[in-house]
Amino acid sequence: MADPYGDGKGLKQQQRQKLKPALEVEDFINLLHGSDPVRVELTRLENELQYKEKELGEAQAEIKALRLSERAREKAVEDLTEELTKVDGKLKLTESLLESKNLEAKKINDEKKAALAAQFAAEATLRRVHAAQKDDDMPPIEAILAPLEAELKLARHEIAKLQDDNRALDRLTKSKEAALLEAERTVQIALAKASLVDDLQNKNQELMKQIEICQEENKILDRMHRQKVAEVEKLTQTVRELEEAVLAGGAAANAVRDYQRKVQEMNEERKTLDRELARAKVSANRVAVVVANEWKDGNDKVMPVKQWLEERRILQGEMQQLRDKLAIAERAARSEAQLKDKFQLRLKVLEEGLRMSTTRTNVSAARRQSIGGADSLSKTNGFLSKRPSFQMRSSVSTTTTTLVNHAKGASKSFDGGCRSLDRYKGHVNGSGMNVSTDSSEDKESNNSDEKANEFTSVETEDTVSGLLYDTLQKEVIALRKACHEKDQSLKDKDDAVEMLAKKVDTLTKAMESEGKKRRMEVAAMEKEMAALRLEKEQDNKAKRFGSSSSQLPPGRTLPRSGSARNM
């Protein structure tokens, strides 16, 4: 019988030849992308396929050995059946001989009994003859006994022959009984061998089922391998397309990098402008303090230098506190910026820029209001000399309130400046209250000339001239204009940064959408490859099962039926 699995080596060679281009494609993919999960899955499936092929080869070898042993056992069973048929024929012959010999023995016994009866009858006749001879004259006894003795001798001779025949028949019966016992033993051995053959046939059927299962698994693995090969080909195509897309998107990436570099440069410029703005604010605050504490007319010098110096010292202390807080906030922002991602940091910087732009607009509006108040003061400077001292002091209170409003607008641009403003308000309000009380005291002292002379003599000590006020006011106006221009430039730059950030966001979203599409396509390809592998494995299993069933021996079950009939 031909081996149905004799072409296993040819199939392995064909599979290896098919795997070579797939391995080259996998090496190319690994060169492009490093470790590939598809290649890992392919290697795992190839290892499983090799393991299953080894198991299939072992199962085929076991099947061949079992088939050879089954053939030998079938031959032994056939020989035993032939021997059993011969022994059965011999038994039948011996039984027929025994029956014939038994019949002959019965006949001999009957003849023996008849001879004994004849002997007894002859003896009785002899007795009668002797009795009759005594009475009457009879023929001689010897003449009568001679034929009878001859017959007796013949009968004894026949009896001896029959006894010899009976002994020979007994020996034959004993030998036949021994042969029957041996035949029964051989029949029992044949039955045991037949049961072993049945067990082996059952095992062979189980092994055939396992072989079919292994063949189905091999078909499934072949299908999966084909699907993986198709997936690899599709992935190579997608890799090529992605490379083309990457090459096409190189210009976009370069543009994004240019935008990022421009954003960094603009952030640096914004930081420098923030520093200059802080310096300008400090100088503007100083100028505002000087302007609030100085008057134009040299004859009507009101505010003493000591009070101005104290207010200046307080404001400088508050500004130093604000600077310290600003430095701490900048350090915290830097430490947080190092931990956060680039895009989040840029977005937060843009948001802070927008917030700063709104606060700057508020500050510029407050400064314009303060500039308008200063202009009105400069216009009404000629009338201030004619007013009395209590009106001048009330104007001092109004200038202090405008200074407080200006300090409010300046402190809102910094973090943590509310507490210093409250303290400054309290201090200024205290000074205003003092001024108002002084004005009320002046109203009361207008009646007496001596008190007015003493008051003017005390307040004219250590005062500042009004000419410095005009120069400081001009410098403040120029600084405000420069700050306004810087604010406008910062707003323009912030708008440009926002536009760049929006473009970066759109580009990142487009890249993410493309990546999601690629992932979905790869998942669909993997599903299709799995389905193709399953179909391939099922086809291979069906083909192998059909080839194995077609190559099986047709008269394989005939010895079983013959042995069963003999049993």
Curated annotation (Swiss-Prot):
Where composition is biased (Basic and acidic residues), the residues are 440-453
- Pfam families documented for this protein: MAP70 (PF07058)
Q: Name one GO biological process term.
A: cytoskeleton organization
| Residue segments, region Disordered | 425-457, 534-567
Q: What is its main location?
A: cytoplasm
Q: Which InterPro entries match?
A: MAP70
Region annotated Required for targeting to microtubules, chain positions? 220-440
- Family, as annotated: Belongs to the MAP70 family.
Q: What does this protein do?
A: Plant-specific protein that interact with microtubules.
| Record protein name field | Microtubule-associated protein 70-1
Q: Which gene encodes it?
A: MAP70.1
